[in-house]
């Protein structure tokens, strides 16, 4: 960051990022890209003509996310927490979109975009040339030094990541002799070639026609016919696993593959270390590279695979037909309920292929999904890639509003127009009805819920609903804000939240846990853990506690006994889920610092803190134990896999420091000096523009996968600084 001497009082900012040499040849003119939004929806558009670009100048928001230079009025560098809050907010408020929300990419997994590109190629829908270029640029910016790709960005190369993205780049037009492709191919062969890809990769290669279905672990659709009360029915599984499995089983049951063409024939030669015709396909079913496999298969998993193979040999034709019809019904209803989005891009891609097989390319199903292809795509500094969902619109907006309330910014007249727009977006995002066929298609009721992303996506999430209700109650009682969301609608949301509680207390994300934990013994993904059923999460539970206590103060006569009973059980869950080290373990953020922040806030809502609660004392000791000499905290994503706190190799990180400070403040930790040092670190890391720079992956999705949540460095940091000022005052910090 630097001050431009030709423009007094102006700071010129630019992301500290540059393309790799391989990626630079694919870049488009980034000054031509514009972001269109509609009720949380994101659609990046390339303006073809100079006249169009001139008539619609690029916004600050667009320049920031693309990594282009931007201009801001210069502000004095902060020397205290309140000044840092004001500088940070002056920057972050400019990232609000025209429809009132804060959005961003939540990319990270390196198989999401490739699945969507493969599906679109098979269906025969061309991709715009500028999008193709930016997709290539992204992959060549995040490629590993050995030329391969991992399960997610910043992870070691795997067969799955490398083969999926190799196929994607070939589809997008890169030739086999391109240096990047030759290097990727060498890594792929060194790791075992495409023969050693996990089941998920084998599926995508099968539908593309570059792998044979006999080499797949069977994915029969018949579990859909099992009584819904039994754990083997997909309705008992985690919602993402369920959605992916249903469409995969449909395509497996039909042995759907793209007819061979020149590219398919070429890939059959390029992906393998032995001739395609000589491969013993049944022997490849359990051939998974050590680089991909999370754990060795158990005897139960091996026996389960053998049983599936035997069943496939002796399957009953009329049951198979019924099961395939049921799978198609489930896919159609999912697509209809989500307005052609599907719960996430991963199942969007496989659902698109199933609907293409059933109804053809000219059907309304494919036309609708073609128009939704752009929704999860985000053009970031590295290029264009699909996010894990169709965005984070509601989640990030609710957290941003909470940050402004905590920092005392919401009550300031100059901020109310911005926050009224945010409130309007939150208002428009509430889901007002249940899904069609709610019970038949295993959906959780959604009437009154708020989604993670957009209303069209239509899935209820416990913590996003809780965070939305909390900020609505807090914001609507500040003078100057309209009561847009009625008491009745808030009560519907509370009813929904109470209905999502698990037996014995605690909250999952999308729906209460439905299946027994032994289902994890049958996990054949090879890539992930704890993905067969939903789980209890301290993060979600704590958000609900904060929501219910906030709501109960404002509406003390609405279901007080039910709310109090839920709060009591939720606290019990938090206490029994605390780790022996004193922290709580997160499944959605990194990791102990993230969950411990939430848990301490939840306990604080019930009046528990370091002075009167042994759990809070242990948690404070845990956080203080891991503070770095510079005052910050830095936790590695590897913590997710190894289940123990691992310091980040690059030292302190802004997000982890913000989490720790928020947790210690919530617990009323008596070590004021440690908190002050953490706050000083956050102030020191702030740039002249008021921003905080991007860091390592902030989020987790399906352990051990990492994801980006780039807005976390803004709203959690603003929360930490604002709460520090509210509790300890605005003292000058020695930076």
Swiss-Prot record:
Single Gene Ontology MF annotation: lanosterol synthase activity
InterPro entries tied to this protein: SQ_cyclase_C (IPR032696), SQ_cyclase_N (IPR032697), Squalene_cyclase (IPR018333), Terpenoid_cyclase/PrenylTrfase (IPR008930)
Recorded metabolic or biological pathway in which this protein acts: Mycotoxin biosynthesis
Keywords: Isomerase, Lipid biosynthesis, Lipid metabolism, Repeat, Steroid biosynthesis, Virulence
Active site: 463 (proton donor)
Function: Protostadienol synthase; part of the gene cluster that mediates the biosynthesis of helvolic acid, an antibacterial nortriterpenoid. Protostadienol synthase helA cyclizes (3S)-oxidosqualene to (17Z)-protosta-17(20),24-dien-3-beta-ol (protostadienol). The synthesis of protostadienol is followed by several steps of monooxygenation, dehydrogenation, and acyl transfer to yield the final helvolic acid.
Cellular component terms (Gene Ontology): lipid droplet
Pfam families: SQHop_cyclase_C (PF13243), SQHop_cyclase_N (PF13249)
Gene Ontology biological process terms from the UniProt entry: (17Z)-protosta-17(20),24-dien-3beta-ol biosynthetic process; ergosterol biosynthetic process; helvolic acid biosynthetic process; secondary metabolic process
Catalytic activity: (S)-2,3-epoxysqualene = (17Z)-protosta-17(20),24-dien-3beta-ol
PANTHER family, A to Z: LANOSTEROL SYNTHASE, TERPENE CYCLASE/MUTASE FAMILY MEMBER
Ranges of the PFTB repeats in the UniProt entry: 132-173, 490-531, 567-607, 616-663
Enzyme class name: isomerase
Induction remarks: Expression is under the control of the secondary metabolism regulator laeA. Expression is down-regulated when gliT is deleted and up-regulated upon exposure to exogenous gliotoxin.
Organism in which the protein naturally occurs: Aspergillus fumigatus (strain ATCC MYA-4609 / CBS 101355 / FGSC A1100 / Af293) (Neosartorya fumigata)
Family: Belongs to the terpene cyclase/mutase family.
Record-listed E.C. numbers: 5.4.99.32
Record protein name field: Protostadienol synthase helA
Keyword Protein biosynthesis tagged: no
SUPFAM superfamilies: Terpenoid cyclases/Protein prenyltransferases (SSF48239)
Native organism taxonomy: Eukaryota, Fungi, Dikarya, Ascomycota, Pezizomycotina
Stated consequence of mutating residue 703 to K: Impairs catalytic activity
């Amino acid at each position: 960051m630097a001050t431009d001497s030709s423009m007094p009082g102006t700071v010129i900012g630019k992301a500290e990022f540059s393309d790799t040499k391989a990626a630079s040849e694919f870049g488009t003119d980034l000054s031509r890209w514009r972001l269109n939004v509609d009720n949380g929806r994101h659609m990046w558009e390339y303006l073809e003509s100079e006249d169009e670009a001139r008539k619609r100048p690029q916004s600050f928001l667009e320049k920031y996310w693309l990594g282009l230079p931007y201009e801001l009025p210069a502000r004095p560098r902060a020397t205290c927490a309140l000044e840092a809050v004001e500088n940070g907010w002056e920057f972050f408020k400019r990232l609000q979109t025209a429809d009132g929300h804060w959005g961003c990419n939540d990319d990270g997994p390196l198989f999401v975009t490739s699945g969507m590109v493969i599906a679109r190629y098979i269906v025969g829908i061309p991709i715009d040339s500028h999008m193709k270029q930016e997709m290539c640029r992204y992959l060549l910016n995040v490629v590993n030094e050995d030329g391969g790709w991992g399960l997610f960005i910043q992870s070691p190369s795997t067969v799955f990541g490398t083969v999926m993205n190799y196929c994607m780049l070939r589809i997008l037009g890169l030739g086999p002799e391109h240096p990047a492709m030759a290097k990727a191919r060498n890594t792929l062969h060194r790791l075992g070639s495409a023969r050693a890809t996990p089941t998920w990769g084998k599926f995508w290669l099968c539908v593309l026609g570059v792998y044979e279905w006999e080499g797949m672990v069977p994915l029969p659709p018949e579990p859909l016919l099992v009584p819904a009360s039994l754990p083997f029915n997909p309705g008992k599984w985690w919602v993402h696993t369920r959605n992916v499995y249903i469409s995969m089983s449909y395509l497996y049951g039909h042995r759907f593959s793209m007819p061979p063409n020149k590219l398919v024939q070429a890939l059959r030669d390029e992906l393998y270390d032995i001739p395609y015709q000589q491969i013993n396909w049944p022997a490849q079913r359990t051939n998974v590279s050590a680089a991909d496999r999370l754990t060795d298969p158990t005897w139960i998993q091996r026996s389960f695979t053998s049983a599936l193979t035997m069943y496939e040999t002796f399957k009953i034709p009329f049951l198979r037909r019924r099961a395939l019809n049921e799978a198609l019904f489930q896919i159609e209803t999912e697509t209809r309920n989500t307005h052609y989005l599907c719960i996430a891009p991963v199942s969007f891609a496989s659902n698109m292929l199933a609907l293409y097989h059933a109804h053809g390319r000219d059907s309304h199903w494919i036309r609708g999904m073609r128009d939704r292809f752009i929704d999860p795509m985000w053009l970031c500094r590295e290029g264009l890639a699909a996010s894990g969902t169709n965005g984070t619109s509601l989640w990030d907006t609710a957290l941003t509003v909470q940050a402004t309330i905590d920092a005392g910014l919401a009550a300031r007249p100059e901020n109310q127009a911005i926050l009224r727009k945010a409130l309007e977006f939150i208002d428009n995002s509430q889901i007002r009805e249940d899904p069609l066929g709610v019970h038949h298609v295993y959906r959780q009721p959604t009437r009154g819920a708020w989604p993670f992303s957009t209303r069209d996506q239509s899935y209820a999430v416990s913590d996003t609903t809780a965070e939305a209700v909390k900020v609505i109650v807090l914001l609507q009682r500040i003078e100057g804000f309209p009561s847009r969301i009625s008491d009745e609608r808030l009560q519907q949301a509370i009813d929904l939240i109470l209905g999502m509680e698990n037996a014995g207390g605690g909250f999952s994300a999308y729906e209460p846990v439905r299946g027994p934990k032994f289902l994890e013994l049958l996990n054949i993904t090879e890539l992930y853990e704890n993905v067969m059923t939903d789980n209890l999460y301290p993060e979600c539970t704590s958000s609900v506690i904060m929501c219910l206590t906030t709501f109960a103060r404002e509406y003390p006569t609405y279901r007080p006994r039910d709310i109090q009973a839920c709060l009591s059980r939720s606290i019990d869950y938090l206490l029994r889920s605390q780790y022996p080290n004193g922290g709580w373990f997160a499944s959605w953020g990194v990791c102990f610092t993230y969950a411990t922040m939430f848990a301490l806030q939840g306990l604080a809502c019930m009046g528990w803190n370091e002075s009167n609660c042994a759990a809070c004392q242990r948690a404070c000791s845990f956080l203080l134990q891991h503070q770095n000499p510079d005052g910050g905290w830095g936790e590695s994503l590897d913590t997710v896999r190894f289940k123990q706190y691992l310091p980040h190799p690059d030292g302190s990180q802004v997000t982890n420091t913000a989490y720790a400070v928020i947790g210690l403040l919530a617990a009323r930790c008596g070590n004021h000096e440690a908190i002050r040092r953490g706050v000083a670190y956050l102030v020191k890391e702030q740039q002249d523009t008021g921003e905080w720079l991007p860091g390592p992956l902030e989020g987790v999705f399906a352990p051990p996968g990492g994801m980006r949540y780039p807005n976390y460095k803004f709203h959690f940091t603003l929360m930490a600084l604002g709460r520090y000022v509210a509790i300890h005052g605005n003292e000058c910090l020695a930076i």
